[in-house]
Each structure stands twice: as C-alpha cells, then as structure tokens.
C-alpha cells in the first residue's frame, strides 16, 4: 500500500494559541515553565491530529518557538559574539531573533520565495560550532510517546543551512565543520528508534544548487558511511530540483520532489528512470495555496509516476507552514467557495483519499470531494474578465521634468523625512475594532474613534517635525487583507492565519473571482488626515504584485491577468486620491522580490509582468503627483533594472538589517530616482542611536545624491509600541537635521 507523509504542520494553532503564549512570555505575563507546558501541549495536539488523519510519517522538528533555522543555529552554537554575555537559554534565543536594548537582532530574510522569514545564521571568526543540545532528539522522544514509530525527524540540511548563512568565507570548509554535529544528531535519533530522517535541502531547486552538487555527494557519502542505519530522505520543494541526473545517485533512501511547482521537469526526470531504485516522496497536494486538489488529475499523475519508482509515498508539495490550519471555522463563506478550500487539515485528508484511490479504492469521501471541486470550477463568480487596457497610459513624462514640478509643489527640504505608512496599533485600537466587528460599536462611533487616532498621530508627527506625514492606517488590520475586504473578487477568513515571522501572523485574503474597484479603499481616512495639516500626507495603497503575492490567489487564470485586474482597481483608487488633492501616493510593492521565481530563466517574464502592472496602476497621474513605492528584504542587485523600470518617483527599501549589502547594489548601479534606504530596524524594540542613523545616512550619501535621498525607518511601525516608536523617530529626525547641517557647511 502507498504511504502518506507530511513535511511540516502549522505552528500557530487553530486559535493562534502559539502566538498568544509566546507574546505573553515576552510581555512578562507567562513564566517560562508555563510557556513550555503550553507549547508542548500544542505539539502533542498537532501530532495527534496527523495520526488521526492517517499520516504514516509525521514530521518532528517542524515546530519551533520562533524559527526552525534559528533552532538549528542555537543547537549548533552558531551564536553571534555580541550575545556572549547571555547564558545559553531561551532569553538568548529570543534576543538573537528580536534584538535587545544593547544588541541588534540577526538579519531576517524570506524563506526562498515565500512570505515566511528565517533568522540568518551569522558566522564569525570566533564561531565554534558544537552540539549544544540535541533538541531534535528531545522532540523525537516526546513524539514517540504520542505517535510511535510514525515519528519522522525533520532537519534543514547542511548545504542549505550554510547557503542561507552570512559571513561564510570558505563554503565547503564550513559545511565540513558541521558534519560531525549532524552525524551525532542522526546517530542519537537512530539509537532512539528513528528510521526515516527528512533532510530539507531546498537550495537544490535554485540555480545556486547546480554549483553545489559535488559538495552534496561528499556530504551524503559521509552520512551514509557514518550512519548506515538511517533512511535519509533528500527533500526539495518550491521548484523542480536541479541536476537530478547526479543528485539521484546520492546514497539516500528516498527523494522528495515538488510536483506542483516543478511538475514538468520533475516528472521528466522520473520518467527517465532516475528513481527506479529509490523511494519517491511525491509532493502532489499544494502546500502553499488553499484550493482543493483536483483528485482525478492528481490520480492520473500518480499513475504516470508509479511504474518508474521503487516505492511511492504521497505528501504535500512543501511544509503546510504556509497555509492556515483548518476551514472548519469559515462558516460565513459561500458554501460552494468554502467547500472548494483546503487548509492544512483538509490537505491531510486529501492525501488519504488519494492514497486510497491509488490503491484501487475510490471511497465515498473521494467522490464527495470530487463533487465539491467540480462545483467550485462551475461557479458563476469565476470568469476571466479583464477590462481593455488599450486606453490605459503606461508611460509618464521624464523623471527630471516630474522632479522639478514636484519640488516646486511640495517644497520639501533635502533629505526629507517620512515613515513607511503604519503606526502602532494599540490594545485600545484592537479592542474597538473587535467591538465594531461584533456589532457592539456602531459604524459612526468606530469611524469617530479612527479619526481621533488619525488626529492624534498627525499632531505627533508635526511635533516630531517629520516632513511627509501619513494617516497611520489605524483602520487596517493588514495591508493586504484590508483591500481584500473592499475589492470585488476577494473574500477574507475568520481564522485563516499564517506565520510570517516570529509571532507575527498574517491572514491572507482569498482571491476567488474577478477583481474590481467597487468602492473607495482609503479615501476618507487620507483626505481627513490631509485636512489636519499643511504638510503633505501620503496616500497609502498596496500594489498589485504584493496583493497577489500576499493573498491566496485563484489558480484558474494566469498571474499576469490577475496582476492587471488588481492594477486597474488600484488605478481607480489613485485617481480618487489625486482628484481629492493628495499630492503624494505610495503604492507598496513590499513583496515584489518575494514572488521572483527561483530559477533565473523564469524571472524576467515575472518582472516584466510586475512592471507592466505597476505602470497600469500608477502612470495615469499628473506629473506633479509624486508616486512612492516600498519594498522589503530584497537582493536588489538582481532586479535593479526592473526597479528602475517601475519609474516610481521615490522608492523606500527595507535595509537596516543588511544595510551594507543594499548599499553595494547602488555603488555598482546608477539609480537616478528618489530613494530612501531604511535607517533603522523596526522589527526590534531597540531604540537606535543618533550616531547609528547618521552613519547609515552618510554611507548612503556616498553613492546617492542628497537631492534624491529620503530618510525613513525600514518598514511600517504597526507592530511597535507607541513610546518606542516616538523615541526612535525623534532620533531619526535629530540625526537627519545634523546631517543637513553638515551638508550645508
């Protein structure tokens, strides 16, 4: 019989119990022993769920207090020297992730092309890896008590781990330093009764992986020789694996391949017979989107694969970390739509149905699921309608002309100061919003409260002497979900939460049908804010690429059509803002880089579509209207031409945790438009010093002119506390004024 495996399960819990426990601990409202007790109960609940769902190989080690890459760094003592004064305990673990009053946090980067963030391992001259504790063994022993021999340890492989690290001088030598530690972890697991061990090596779906195949042979030869009893699974996901003709010869028991995002290439490799002597762990249920699987199409795929492999195991295409837990609470949705959704728990059920069908037993549940899938495909809200783009202006006047008109209109100083958009959402804001959602607060009272917050923060910004203000986004839970609630073709969930970084969870909207602008999105709040001040207030919108990348997108039309549908909707809102006297409009594309395909050969088509959509949204404005955009966590040297092609008057970039890397991009490539490189890290509660911000500004001015440079935090301030936000912005403004004086002299 075919088996079913899982790669990873969401940490958050059905009601975000994980987030609540960790944040209570950070706030000093929960003792460590109580935190550990609550997290253990969550882990056990997740294990039991998967066992009851019929999963034969249940992941262990996917659960974390913050991030699984940080777990590995902590286990192997890859600890930045600046944290030497800490004992090796949970306080240190969280300090690395979040920073403290004296030390900046480690860098945070996107996990491949997802919206999940990992903590970058830092290697220094003083780094001395050793097995500080075998936490994976502890988790495995705990899991065996619950699920027995179904427990399958999961660990990020050494080649991927080092690839994701900073400070690497000699790549292969660094990998070799880790091998004895991995060996000890594996041997301890085998001695404790483990059989299958999943080693995640997603670096081998990237172009970089092609350069690492020889190292992989050396590494996995070592593991096979030193821990011969282990049944290793070489796991990839998010794309087709590279160099499978060589990787398939590695001395491992099985290979995990993604047949959702790399179907054609991976299937071709299978049909070449590369896995006839291997177990294949086939990722055939989408681990990154929330639509029910097409059972018949997937069953046909399995029948294609089956004859070419030694043994077949079914699994999701990736960890289920990237989807919500369960659809059972989404009773408010249209029944046809709800029945067409599949979150983590439903995906496990789909795998069970497919395994049974592949073994020749199409159960009643199989036919019911097939019927629900067919009903969604036939629904009348799913068309492929796209307004004609023939009348849409795609090019603006030359930047120099626009710059002069905008300078005359806005009258800003050199090095203008601003923020990215959002301000802290206090407990009072959350309380009022919840009361409003539950019907305990009238629409008018809620709007009055939001206006009070806008008025208060406009005054705060004026007191700080910021140059360009924002309304603060107090009406928004999330920069994408908010728009999903107001545009046609979107819906939102009650508990469809997904982990983004640390304890931060997002609730992506679902794009289920054609997207259209049917009502103002942020007009009222923005115009009200502008009425309170003579300084310019930015209109704050989210761009079409970010809305798509941070939503669960429909899978029945092309991405370019979806980009363009959303772009036309955003264009309508921009025109409303401009007509209402808003002179600066920011269209955030925080996730543009995130959506970049992992293979270079596929990237330009995506970037071309992204640039076209941004221009559809923004190019119809007057020359004197200043268009801003914002981007997060990006390797900009790779996409600098496309960023330039967006033709935004000003771009702000989240850079503070990797300021030097970003600066290098602009030292080697001329960027002629306005730009703000984030001068301090908003993801840490630490208040930056004036000297730090001055250094960041001065370094930026070595490759950017004072006429084009803006000073801003590196991201929105929604997750920070009010006091630390004001304190940090005071430092930012003071530092900027000092640099202005230096430039005047």
Swiss-Prot record:
The active site is at 683 (proton donor). InterPro entries: Cbl-indep_Met_Synth_N, Cobalamin-indep_Met_synthase, Met_Synth_C/arc, UROD/MetE-like_sf. It comes from the Bacteria. L-homocysteine binds at residues 420-422, 473, 588. L-methionine binds at residues 420-422, 473, 588. Keywords: Amino-acid biosynthesis, Metal-binding, Methionine biosynthesis, Methyltransferase, Repeat, Transferase, Zinc. Its cofactor is Zn(2+). One of its GO terms (molecular function) is 5-methyltetrahydropteroyltriglutamate-homocysteine S-methyltransferase activity. CDD domains: CIMS_C_terminal_like, CIMS_N_terminal_like. One of its GO terms (biological process) is methionine biosynthetic process. It is an enzyme of class 2 (transferase). 5-methyltetrahydropteroyltri-L-glutamate binds at residues 16-19, 110, 550, 594. Pathway: Amino-acid biosynthesis; L-methionine biosynthesis via de novo pathway; L-methionine from L-homocysteine (MetE route): step 1/1. Binds 1 zinc ion per subunit. The keyword Amino-acid biosynthesis applies. It catalyses: 5-methyltetrahydropteroyltri-L-glutamate + L-homocysteine = tetrahydropteroyltri-L-glutamate + L-methionine. Zn(2+) binds at residues 630, 632, 654, 715. Its EC number is 2.1.1.14. Catalyzes the transfer of a methyl group from 5-methyltetrahydrofolate to homocysteine resulting in methionine formation. PANTHER family: 5-METHYLTETRAHYDROPTEROYLTRIGLUTAMATE--HOMOCYSTEINE METHYLTRANSFERASE. Belongs to the vitamin-B12 independent methionine synthase family. This is 5-methyltetrahydropteroyltriglutamate--homocysteine methyltransferase. It comes from Streptococcus agalactiae serotype Ia (strain ATCC 27591 / A909 / CDC SS700). The gene is metE.
